[in-house]
């Protein structure tokens, strides 16, 4: 969240942040489901899924253009309103709007395509996901904690 971003700026002011593209995709999938029913939902899901295939800045630029064009194309659909059970007027396609906003925010913050910045790579390709840490270090920590469930912290 915001706490991490503040801490990163304080400790490493010049560090660049990369949002895991897989987790960005999952955020959209949570909002649209894996089988969206509307055309706008299907297209948003595909845009998010295609995020996982981007290999260079040119592809990233095309992807951002698709995201912007999606918003323009579905503007009328996305502006539809409904009244909830408490009588409050809300966007009818709230979850779809949330999905789009999550991606647009990452684009604005420049945290979606940091892995494509050649000045950071030192000849080695940077990962677009955090699979290495999730499957490596974090998995070992989770296993250790699971095996020692109930162990008092003072003994750890």
Located regions from the model:
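Conserved beta-strand -> loop -> alpha-helix junction used to position metal-binding or nucleic-acid-contacting
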Residues: 1-2, 6-48
